[in-house]
A protein has these predicted regions:
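Extracellular, repeat-based ectodomains that mediate carbohydrate processing or recognition
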Residues: 19-481
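Sec-dependent N-terminal signal peptides
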Residues: 4-14
C-alpha cells in the first residue's frame, strides 16, 4: 500500500514537472478589452493579424461603449513588437456597433500599405488604407478611404495568391451565393469573378444555404474550399427543422455534410477532389453528387472545417461534429488514405461552433482544440429563441441552458494534440494564459500569416472572456519560445 502511494506521488509529480517544462516553451501576451462575441472572428472571416519583420499588426472588436448583454464595440488596431515583446499604439478606426460581423480584417497590399476592412454584413463595409508603408500610425489621420467591392459583402476573407490578391465572401444574405474577387499586382481596383462558386438553392432547393472556409494551396495557385449545408428555413416551418437522426427540432444551429471544391485561380475553373471538371455555380444536387467528402447522415456542425494540406499535398480537414446525441460532440481529422476518406477521432468538444486550428510542422500534425466537458447551451441560441416562440420545448433535447451571450458560439479550454500520421492522436499540453482561471473560456484560434500569405507556425491569436459577473474580455497572442 505504501509503495503504491509512493508510486502515485511520483507519477503526479512527474506529470506536473512535465507540464511546467512545457509551459516554459511558450508565452502568451494579452491585448485589448471590452470585446464582444467574435472579438476575433472565426475562420469564415480572416485575418485579424499580419506579421511583417518584427511587427505583428492586430485588429479586433473592442472598447465597448455600453454594458448591454450585446454591447457595442469598435474596430481597434494595435501592434506587437517581437523583439521587445511589447504592444504599440492602440486606437479605434470607426464607430461602434453591436453587430459582431463588423469585425475588421487586415492585410498588406503590393505597395506595402496596410489595409483594414470592417463593417460588412450584407453591406459594402468600410475600407481603409494606411498613408505610410507598413505603418498603422497613431490616429485616423494616418489613413485614407479605399475603394472596395460594389456589392454586398458578408464574411470577407483575404489571401495572397500567385496571381494577385483574393477576397472570398458571401454575396449578400444567407441564401445568396459565395464568390471571390481578385486584384492583380498592377491593378488598382478589385474585380469580382462573374460566376459564384456555390449557389445551393438555384435548382429548386428552396432556401438551402451553406457556410464556407478556404485556404490556398502551398503554391498559391489553387483555392481549397470546404463547405457545409443547411436549410435556412426563413418561414420557420418546424417540420423543416426536424432532425430524424436525433428525433428533435434543432433549427439551423446545425449544418450538415462536408463538401470540397477546388478552384484554379488562373483559369477560374472548378474541380472536385478527383479532378472532375465542374460547372459553376455548384448547386445542392451537384454538391451531393460530386463534392461530398462526408455524408454526416444528420450529424451536425456549426462552423465549417479548418483545411490543411496533408503530407501528400491533399486537402485534409479538422471538423467538429455531433455524435450519438445532439449534446455530444467530437473533433475528427478527415484525410484521404488508401483510396478513401478516413475520419479519425481526436477528442470530445462542447459546442458545434468551437473554432480550433491545425498546422503541420516538423513532420507532425498539431491540432489546437477548444475543449470542455459540459455542452454549452444559452438562451441566445437561435434554436432556443425559436423553440420558446413556438412553444416547442418538449420537442427538443437541447433545452438545458448553461451560458450567456458570449457563449452563443461555444468556447472552452485550449489543448494541443499531436499526431505523426493523422490517425492516432495524443494529448500534448494545455494552453492557459496567465491571470485567467476556470471562469475563463476561449475560442477562435487563428494562426498568423505574413504579407505573402505564409503561415507562421509558432504564433497564433485567440480571444477569451470571463463568464463571471465582471464580464472581462481579452485577445491573446501565443508565441512558441
Amino acid at each position: 500500500m505504501i509503495n503504491k502511494l509512493i508510486a502515485i506521488i511520483i507519477l503526479t509529480t512527474s506529470q506536473l514537472s512535465a507540464q511546467l517544462e512545457l509551459d516554459k516553451k511558450f508565452a502568451i501576451y494579452s491585448f485589448g478589452e471590452g470585446g464582444n462575441l467574435k472579438m476575433l472572428y472565426d475562420r469564415r472571416q480572416r485575418p485579424q493579424a499580419l506579421k511583417e519583420g518584427n511587427e505583428i499588426y492586430l485588429v479586433y472588436n473592442g472598447n465597448k461603449v455600453n454594458e448591454d448583454e450585446k454591447p457595442k464595440t469598435m474596430p481597434i488596431i494595435t501592434s506587437f513588437n517581437l523583439k521587445t515583446k511589447t504592444f504599440g499604439n492602440s486606437y479605434n478606426l470607426g464607430s461602434a456597433s453591436s453587430d459582431h460581423h463588423y469585425c475588421p480584417i487586415i492585410w498588406a497590399d503590393k505597395k506595402m500599405k496596410i489595409n483594414v476592412f470592417y463593417g460588412a454584413h450584407n453591406s459594402q463595409g468600410i475600407h481603409l488604407i494606411s498613408k505610410n508603408k507598413l505603418s498603422i500610425g497613431k490616429s485616423m489621420d494616418d489613413w485614407e478611404k479605399g475603394t472596395f467591392l460594389e456589392t454586398p459583402v458578408s464574411y470577407p476573407s483575404f489571401s495572397t495568391s500567385a496571381f494577385g490578391d483574393i477576397i472570398y465572401f458571401r454575396n449578400g444574405g444567407h441564401t445568396t451565393n459565395w464568390r471571390y474577387a481578385q486584384k492583380k499586382d498592377n491593378e488598382k481596383y478589385w474585380t469580382t469573378i462573374d460566376i459564384p462558386t456555390t449557389d445551393l438553392d438555384i435548382s429548386g432547393m428552396f432556401e438551402w444555404s451553406s457556410y464556407h472556409s478556404y485556404i490556398l494551396s502551398d503554391d498559391k495557385k489553387f483555392m481549397h474550399i470546404a463547405f457545409i449545408s443547411y436549410d435556412d428555413n426563413k418561414e420557420n416551418n418546424p417540420g423543416r427543422y426536424f432532425n430524424e437522426r436525433y428525433n428533435s427540432i434543432v433549427t439551423n444551429d446545425y449544418k450538415y455534410n462536408l463538401y470540397y471544391l477546388k478552384i484554379d485561380l488562373q483559369t477560374q475553373r472548378a474541380y472536385n477532389f478527383f479532378g472532375k471538371s465542374l460547372k459553376l455555380p455548384i448547386d445542392l444536387n451537384t454538391a451531393n453528387k460530386d463534392c461530398i467528402i462526408w455524408n454526416t447522415e444528420g450529424r451536425g456542425s456549426g462552423i465549417p472545417p479548418q483545411i490543411i494540406e496533408d503530407k501528400n499535398g491533399n486537402p485534409a480537414f479538422l471538423h467538429v461534429i455531433t455524435e450519438e446525441n445532439i449534446n455530444k460532440l467530437q473533433y475528427y481529422f478527415v484525410k484521404f488514405l488508401n483510396k478513401k476518406w478516413t475520419k479519425s477521432p481526436i477528442r470530445s468538444s462542447n459546442h458545434q461552433w468551437n473554432n480550433a486550428d491545425i498546422i503541420f510542422k516538423k513532420n507532425k500534425y498539431h491540432a489546437y482544440l477548444i475543449t470542455g466537458d459540459k455542452v454549452i447551451k444559452t438562451p441566445f441560441d437561435d434554436a432556443q429563441k425559436f423553440l420558446n416562440q413556438k412553444g416547442l420545448k418538449n420537442w427538443t433535447k437541447i433545452n438545458e441552458l448553461s451560458g450567456g451571450y458570449m457563449d452563443k458560439h461555444g468556447g472552452g479550454q485550449i489543448e494541443e494534440w499531436v499526431s505523426e500520421d493523422g490517425i492516432n492522436w495524443n494529448f500534448y499540453k494545455k494552453i492557459v494564459p496567465e491571470n485567467t482561471d476556470s471562469d475563463w473560456r476561449f475560442n477562435n484560434i487563428q494562426f498568423i500569416k505574413d504579407r505573402f500569405g505564409n503561415q507562421i507556425k509558432d504564433a497564433f491569436i485567440f480571444y477569451g472572456w470571463n463568464i463571471s459577473k465582471e464580464r472581462q474580455t481579452s485577445g491573446f497572442l501565443y508565441l512558441d519560445n
